[in-house]
Every structure is written in structure tokens, then in C-alpha cells.
């Protein structure tokens, strides 16, 4: 009972603190609305304080207007952080529901308090806050920590699904809702085709962050995880590009008609915006990697370079009306490959946790704003539009999933099963992106904006609460194929070997696939890019670098899980010995590294095998005599045992088929017959004597002189 009561008391403390913060936020909003003046500048504040000459110095003053904006921003961030802490206090709660559900509930609670105290809709974000401050950290974190190899191995299926799937969902939902709006009984006749298509583009933006958390816990197979991850990474960018193009069409349609040329220009702009954003991101990633080559002595600014250049890529792309989301994604992927090898380990840890912190805070604020906007007067309800929107989202999601994956499975070595496709269909959770795009619709172009916001909230609430909560049990019920354990160093080395081997086989056969593309890029990378972008481009063994990377990763994981704290601390005697050991100089370390590199690069020499074709001639007299003596002893022993000479076939013997079964009697009987035949034949002894005499004369000559001993080696071989 004691620990349970302590946990309950701690939970009640957190809940009470959350309530206090919500009341503070509500009171700050009331003060903001009741104050006739806005935020004062320091000069205006000084002028106001010095306007009355008879005013005395007061001991205590209250000036909320001066700190209003940073105070409220700090309160919002603190409220979001405490909400996440409270969510993870109960260890069972994250397994039952996604984190976004609790954040929406907390936001709805805050909105209810604000609306109840002042009877006015609570404050929400505008377009500049969302697109310039909240969205970039989320996209940067997703791109930087993306598993690169699985992503590019499935890049074809990801682009096929994320790109074409977003277009099918957007136009399918938009056209279906347009036909529903033509029914006069529903009272939706004032919503035209462009407005429905625009609503379809924003409602098709999925946000399966909660689903990815469930997949990581369930350890589903890698290709299923990468399809959902790739959709989450690219779908927002595609939806935002389509959203901006359709808004431009809506503005144009207000003043003039849209022609076929405008539609072709819109399609061309869709391609240029996407490709231009990727190009900008890669360029800024290369620039940041090149600058980090020279930061070995000032490593404190390395995290600043990473964040500033990634944010600059987003702003530069948005300045030229390109896709900032795709730009910052490409920049993050490029920096992940090159910048990590230049920055120190401390800078890498700082980048990792600061990036995750910014992404978590931004996403939490968006979900809380979503809950806040639920309560207020900015809603319009229409049963037909809301219900058909929810139905069409599910229908077109199913059509796009099963159609596109049926086509892609025809070209895949490992196709997606029906279970995988069902999980992908069920993972279409709408979230912060759809709500933000709906809330940022210009009211002058969309008179039914409140209806769009209401329908978006209903779809988001249904997918987040219902699908987000039930996706875990569904994965366990369907028994989706699980992933393998983490690759060991042996598996990693064999994967690299097989990639290189497959590229060579394809080159010999005249075929082409992604193995050759990867191999050519690796050669180009090692030959040019790494020499320019990497600080110390010295030839190192890939085994050494991979071992160092795995050891570093294992040490970080042990430090994060607390395993290093369980290791016994060294005794004072050991500490003295460690301190007494002389540290290696940089020259010694460099020489050791060179020795290891050379030895690991060298191929072990194979021992030569000798035969009669490569045997070197020997001129030693002792060796020739020894060979002759041993040969004579061998022949004498064979004759003493009653055996015939190996090169003489005794008379009357049969031709045996070797490497097959004999014709007749077993081995002992055959040996007896051969012995009887050979012992009674005097020609064998005479032939043996003459042969030995001829060999001696051939080697030593008729007068006993040594001739060419190498002839003996040839004869014996």
C-alpha cells in the first residue's frame, strides 16, 4: 500500500499543478483581453512611469503587459512538458492510448476554462507561428533520425505510395464531397469544386506518429515500418505543396476563369516545387558539412551550425515558393551522413537531444492548440458533410492502399502481405497537419471555413482516439510478421560484401538495379565528396570504422539505460596504477592506427602447393641419394610381402575397374592369388634387378659420377 499511495499522491500533485497552470493561462488571457493597450516597449514604459511628477517610488508594482508574450509562451511550453510527464507517470497508460490523446484532452480542458471564464473563443495560432516555428523542428527531427539504408532500399515503394497515394486520397475525397454538395437537401450548394479539392488535400495529410510508437513497441517487420515512416515523412510535404497550389487556383478563380494552361502550369509547379526543395536541402547540407571541417577547436558552435543551416534551408526554400518541408528533410539526411563524422561526440549528443526536445515541444503545442480550439464559437455543424467526410476518408484510403500495393507487389522481391496492407490502411491517422491547414484557411476565400474546421476535428478525433488506441491490439491479433533482432557486426559485414558482389554480378551480366547505383555512389562519395566534406579523410579500414561505430553506439545505449552505473568503480590502488600509466602521444596512436590499417587491408598470402610442374630443381647430392635409397627400400618391402611391382601386371590377372565395385572375390582372396602368381615367376626378379641397375646408371653414370639429379625427381613424380 505504501508505494501505491506514494504514486497516487505524486500523480495528484502533478494534476493539481496542471490545474494551477491552466488557471494561470486563463487569467493571463483575461488580462490580455481586458487590457486596452498592447505590449509596451521599454521606452513607452519609461515614459509612462515618468509622466506623473508627483508619483512616489512604490515598493511593489505589477506590469504584466511588459512580459505578456514571453510569459504566455513559457506557460504553454511548461504546460505541454508537464502534460507529457504526467502521461508517462502511469506505465500502463502509454500502452493503452497514444500520447496525442492525452494532449488533446489537456488542451480541451484549458480551452474550457478559458471559454468558461470569459465566454470567448480561446486564442489559437496563426499561419506564421505554425509554418515558421512549429513545423520545422518536427520535420527536421524526422529527417535527421531516419534509418537511411532501409529508406533508400524501399524508396521506390515509398514514393509510389506516399506521392501517388496522397494525390488519390486528395482528389478522391474532394470529388466525392463535391457530388455530395450537389444534393440540395444537404444545404451545401455554395461549396464549389475547388474548395472541395482543397479540403480533400488538407484532410489527406496523415500523421501516424502514434502508430510508429506502437510499431516500435510491437517490433513489426522493417519494410512495413519504413512504409509508414516514409508516408509520415513525405506526405506532409506533398499535401502542403498541393494545398498551396489549390489556394492559388482559388484566388485566381475569384477573378477569372481557370484554363487548361493554368492546370498544366500547376502540375509543372508541383514538380518544380518538390525537386527544388530537395535541391536546396542538399546544397545547405553540403555547406554545413564543409564548415564543420574546421570546428575541431571550437566544438561549442557545432550544434548551432547544424540547427541554423537546416532552418536556413527551410526559409530559403519558402522564400522562393519551394517546398520548405522537403528542403529541411533533404538537408537533415545530408547532414546526418557527413556532419556526424566531423562533430565531436559531445556535440552529437547535444544535437540529438536538443532536436528531439524541439520536436516534442512543437508537436505537443500543436495537439494542445487542437484541444483548445475544440471549445469555442468557431464551429459549424452539418451532419451530412461531417459524416460523409469521415466515410470517404476511410473508403479512399482503402482504395489507394490495396490498389497501389497490388501494383507495387508485382515488382518487389518481398511483397507486402494482406496483413501488412490492412495495417497500412488502418494507420491513416490524421493529426496536427490536417488541423493546422484547415485552421489556416483564409476566411475571405472560404466562407464555410468553420464547417471545414469542424469536419477536420471530427476526423482527427476519430482517427486519433479510435484507430490510435486499437492499432496495437490489431497488430497483435493479426500476428504481423516481426522484425529480426539488431544486426551484428558479422551480419553488417556480410551485407556489405553481398551488395558489392551483386553489383559485380549485375555488371558482368549487363543488368542494372539499385545495387549498381549504390556501388557507383559509394565510389563517387569516397573519391570526391568525402575528400571535400570530411575533416580527416584518411584511408581507414571499414572494419575498424564499423567496429568503432558499433562500440560507440553500444556505449551510448548502456549510458542511457543506466548499465554503466552498475559497473564497480575502480579501487584506489587501481586508480593510482591508471594514473601512473603514461599516456600515449598522438604520434604513437597514429602509428598504431597505421599498423592496424595496413594489416587489416593486406590479404593473407596463401602457401604455395608443389607439384611436378612447379618443383624447383635440386642439385644436392645428399638429397638425390636419400631419394634413391628410400625408393629401393620401398620396392624391396613390397616384394618381400609378396606383392607385384606397381607398373608390372602379372600374367593371368584380370583388368579391374577402379572407382567401382570389383567383379568377384573379396580383397584377401585377391591378394593371395596375386602373391602366388608373382612369387613363382622368376622373370619378375630379373626385371626388378635390371630396372634398378638402369636407374643407378642413369643417375650416377656408368663410372659412378653424378649426372643430373633432377631427372630422378621427374621420374619419381
From Swiss-Prot:
GO MF, one annotated term: potassium:proton antiporter activity
Swiss-Prot/TrEMBL GO biological process terms: gastric acid secretion; glandular epithelial cell development; potassium ion transmembrane transport; regulation of intracellular pH; sodium ion import across plasma membrane; transepithelial ammonium transport
Subcellular location: Basolateral cell membrane; Apical cell membrane; Zymogen granule membrane
Gene3D superfamilies: 6.10.140.1330, 6.10.250.1040, 6.10.250.2020
Topology of this chain in the membrane: Multi-pass membrane protein
GO cellular component: apical plasma membrane; basolateral plasma membrane; plasma membrane; zymogen granule membrane
Catalysed reaction, written as an equation: Na(+)(in) + H(+)(out) = Na(+)(out) + H(+)(in); Na(+)(out) + NH4(+)(in) = Na(+)(in) + NH4(+)(out)
Residues modified by glycosylation: 342
Chain ranges inside the bilayer that never cross it: 14-28, 70-90, 421-441
UniProt tissue specificity: Most abundant in stomach, followed by colon. Lesser amounts were found in kidney, liver, brain, uterus and skeletal muscle. Predominantly expressed in the inner segments of inner medullary collecting ducts (IMCD) in kidney. Highly expressed in the cavi amnoni fields of hippocampus. Expressed in pancreas. Expressed in multiple nephron segments including proximla tubules, medullar thick ascending limbs (MTAL), cortical thick ascending limbs (CTAL), distal covoluted tubules and cortical and medullary collecting ducts. Expressed in submandibular gland.
Intervals, Cytoplasmic compartment: 1-13, 29-69, 91-94, 149-154, 217-225, 291-304, 378-384, 472-717
SUBUNIT field: Homodimer; each protomer has one site for sodium and one site for proton binding. Interacts with CHP1 and CHP2.
Protein name per the record: Sodium/hydrogen exchanger 4
Organism: Rattus norvegicus
Origin organism lineage: Eukaryota, Metazoa, Chordata, Craniata, Vertebrata
